[in-house]
Amino acid sequence: MQLKPILSLCLITSLLALAGCGGREKITDFSQLAQAEFAVPTGTVADQLVASRFPEARFEYYNSVLDAALAVRSGKADAAAYDEPILRNIAGKNPGLKVLPEPITVDQYGYAVRLEDLELKAAIDAVISEMRAGDEYQQMLDRWLPRQGAPAPMPVLDTAGEEVLLFGTAAVTEPFSFVDGSQQVVGLDVEMAARVAQRLGRRLEVVNMEFGAMIPALIAGKVDMIGACITITEERAKSVLFSESYYTGGISALVRE
């Protein structure tokens, strides 16, 4: 994730339910985005990324991705632009909205460890590879990114051991990392970290923090591994060691069905 953290998505259903449909032409084809009016959260680079693909696009700015989605639902904007998995989560819980299949930009998401922690990187890569080789990876995606409805409950993954695996995350990136109804930090990234802890025979401890604090905390040794929809970039790779990519995401467009 290259954008600033968003507010919790727990109110999205009730917020969107208040809105009606406007008189704008529905976006049904990716090419229609070329001159579309986008709703984007203030303080992110979503507008810059969209403009790099569609120079003639227009932008309206909102306080959060929730407000941007509401603008689309009410007809105040043609599309909302944000991280693909977060938009998919919104669309899954709110009939009448969908994410266009073609992304505007493409990013690879990965977990990060300290530059010298080759053993932990190898363990993460092995878990990712083994899950992809079987059915577990797709089952995990179906669990956290259902076509309709909210994510399924966090699976029970017992982690035990004298050593602790400290997993740093920012629980504002539903469905990758978020706080559920029981006030536990859950999500696809948390599940993956638990599987890594199991492989290493360690006990998982989740450390929730601000998105921008994750890399500094990792470098300082406050956590062992970080993950929260983190985009693999050359600049970040100068200071941390990334795992293999576990998800292809990027900036996508949320539109009315």
Task: List the predicted regions and their residue ranges.
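Extended, hydrophobic interaction surfaces within ordered domains
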Residues: 31, 57, 64-68, 74-149
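Short, hydrophobic beta-strand segments that form beta-sheet elements in well-ordered domains
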Residues: 36-41, 255
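Extracytoplasmic small-molecule ligand-binding "clamshell" domains
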Residues: 37, 56-61, 65, 69-70, ...
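Secondary-structure junction motif
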Residues: 39-52
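Hydrophobic alpha-helical segments typical of transmembrane helices
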Residues: 46-49, 107, 123, 136, ...
